[in-house]
Amino acid sequence: MESHIDNILKDLEKDNFQAYLLTQFTNVEYISRYKPTSFAFCIIKENPIIYASGMDMELANRDSSIEVRKYESYNVMIDELKKEGIKNLAIEPSLPFSTYVKFRDDFEIDSKTYIDKQRMIKTPSEIEKIAKATEIAQKSFLDLDILNNSGTEKEVAFDLVRLMIENGASKESFDTIVTSGAASSLPHAIPEAKKLAQPILIDWGAIYEGYCSDNTRTMVYTERQQEIWDIVAEAHDKAIKDIKPGLKCCEIDKVARDIIEDYGYGDKFIHSTGHSLGLDIHETPGFSLRDDTIIEEGMVITVEPGIYLEGEFGVRLEDTVSISKRASVIGDLPLMID
C-alpha cells in the first residue's frame, strides 16, 4: 500500500498539487486495505488520512494501513486541511458533484486520474488473487454439472453462487447471468423461472480477498448454434494470441471485430471486446474501438466477443488474461463444455 501512496505523491509533486481526495470505496480499499461500508474521505498527502463514518470506525481502525479519524463534518475536515497549509486539491474523476461543491470554495481543484493509472497495473499479489477467484469460479461451474442440470435458470444461478461461496468466495463478483434459448441474445439477460433451453449461456464470477473474476461459456446444441460458436471462438482465440505490450487496446478490439465482420455478423457484435478487472468488475482500460490506451505488462483484461441474433440465440465466450510479454489466460476451463 505504501508504494501506491508513494507513486501518487510523486504525481502530486509533478503537477504541483498538495493532496488527492478519494471517496470511491474500492479506491479507498486499494490505498488502505479498508473498504468503507458507509462513506469515507481518503486524503493522500505527506501524512495520508481517512475520515471514516462513525459506524465504520471499528472496521476502519481494524483494517486501515493509514491513520483514521472519525468524520465530524465537512467544515471540520476542510479546516484541518487548511491548517496544514493545503491550498489545492486533486480529486478522483468519479468524485460526486455534491462532494466537489463542498470543497470548491476553499481549494483550487482539478480532476486527476492518478488512481486509475495506478490500478491499471496489477501487482503479482493482485494477479494471484484474481487467479484464485477464477479458480473458485471455474471449479464451481464444473461442480454445477450444467449439461446434466434440470433446474430453472434462477435455480442454476442460485446454485452457482452457493457453490462459489462454499468453495471459498466471499460472494459473486456481479449478478450471475444464466440464460438460455432465445433470451441468450440479450447480453445482460436476467435469469428466469423457466427450465433451461438451448443454447445455455452463463456469465459468472467470484470475489476472493476483494478481487474479481469473470468468465462466460455458451453451451450449444444445434449445427446453427455450433456455426456461430465457432466464429466467436475464432475471434476470442485470435484476440488473445495478438495481445502484447505496446499495442493499443482498440487494436485488439479490431482483431476480434474484424473476424466477426468477415463472417457477416459485424452488426451482431454489440459491445466491446473486453474490460479490465480487479477490485471492481469493470475497470480501465478496455478492449474497445474508442480506447487508445497502450497495453502494458501487468494489465489484467477480459476477452469476450459475442454474436447476438435477436429472436434466435446468442453466443459469448469470455476469459480473463494477464499480460506480460504476451497474454496468458487465467484459469484452465475449456471453451467447449461437453
Over which residues does each language-model region extend?
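Active-site neighborhoods and metal-handling regions in enzymes and metal-associated proteins
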Residues: 1-338
